Amino acid sequence: MSTGSLSDVEDLQEVEMLDCDSLKVDSNKEFGTSNESTEEGSNCENGSPQKGRGGLGKRRKAPTKKSPLSGVSQEGKQVQRNAANARERARMRVLSKAFSRLKTTLPWVPPDTKLSKLDTLRLASSYIAHLRQILANDKYENGYIHPVNLTWPFMVAGKPENDLKEVVTANRLCGTTAS
């Protein structure tokens, strides 16, 4: 999900540049290469590359004749793999940046705290649930709850923990995945 920030635009431009480079490589490929390399390319574009040879989508190899172009075909496959690897690295960089931005926007998480992606998502989810609870309760002090009145993990100070759990579980959107 995009936040609309400047860094999101930069990340998307980086991924698009890598995609354009791979398209140039694909358009320069000679005709006469095996169908296998084009099938691999289509799998990478769909975002669901097959893992190993024993996956659900087993395909029969069409009998191929050995030709002097096999060296060129191998080079084309290697270039295609390198382009796919570069796209995957760029995608992972974008994802890591998004998680680090999310971690820094969570209150009460020190910058040097090492959180897993799952912990970051859980904290963000509980923080959102807490904000929803505040809005639902509509118990503002002059229309505003100061952050000093909030305690870890995101509950209103002085409110019994059991009451908080009841409200959070009633408003939870994540279902069984939340703890």
UniProtKB/Swiss-Prot annotation:
It holds the Pfam family HLH. Residues 30-49, 70-80 have a biased composition (Polar residues). Residues 79-131 form the bHLH domain. It comes from the Eukaryota. GO terms for molecular function: bHLH transcription factor binding; DNA-binding transcription activator activity, RNA polymerase II-specific; DNA-binding transcription repressor activity, RNA polymerase II-specific; E-box binding; histone deacetylase binding; nuclear androgen receptor binding; protein dimerization activity. Residues 19-88 are annotated as: Disordered. Efficient DNA binding requires dimerization with another bHLH protein. Forms a heterodimer with TCF3 and binds the E box (5'-CANNTG-3'). Involved in epithelial-mesenchymal interactions in kidney and lung morphogenesis that include epithelial differentiation and branching morphogenesis. May be involved in the organogenesis of the spleen and heart and in cardiac and coronary artery development. May function in the development and sex differentiation of gonad via transcriptional regulation of AD4BP/SF-1. This is Transcription factor 21. It comes from Mus musculus (Mouse).
